[in-house]
Amino acid sequence: MKPNNNQKVRVIAFYLPQFHPTPENDRWWGKGFTEWTNVGKAKPLFKGHYQPRVPADLGYYDLRLPETRQAQADMAREYGIEGFCYWHYWFGNGKQLLQRPFNEVLNSGKPDFPFCLAWANHSWEDKQFNKDGGHKMLMEQLYPGDEDYLSLIHISEPTRHAQIS
C-alpha cells in the first residue's frame, strides 16, 4: 500500500470532563471534589519530580462556566488543535456522568469548535483511592444494546462534529 502524502494529519485533543463538581463525586469523594482535588494532592515521587503542578494560563478552571470552555477552544485553535474529543461517560440504562460541559456546548452552540466523542467504556470503582486493597463498584458499565446507539443520535445533527474523510 502506497502512502497518500496529500492527507493532512489532524490534531484533536482529548477533553476530560472531570473538572467541575457533581453530586456523584460529592457523595463518593467529598463535597466539591473534582480532578483538581487530585492535582493539588500530587506528591513528588523522585528527585527533580516537581509536584504538584499548578495549572498555567486558565488556572483551576471550572467547566460549568461558558467563558472557560470558550477560552479553551480559543487556546486550542491558537496552537493548531482542530477539535476536542469529549470523554463521554455513558453507563447504559439512561445513566450518564460528567455530561454537563458537553451538553452545554451542544445546546448553546458555543464554543463554535469541532468535536467528537470517545466512549469511556468502563465501570467506575473506588479502587484507585481505596487504601485497604479492596474495591467497591460506584457505577457499573452496562450494555443494553440499541439504547447505546440511540442515546447519541441527537448529536449527529450539528455541523460542528469533527468529520473524517
Regions found by a protein language model. Name each.
Residues 23-26, 96-98, 127-129:
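Short, solvent-exposed loop/turn and secondary-structure capping segments
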Residues 28-30, 100-102, 131-134:
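Short secondary-structure boundary/capping segments
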Residues 103-124, 133-152, 156:
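Acidic, His- and aromatic-enriched active-site or binding-groove loops in soluble protein domains
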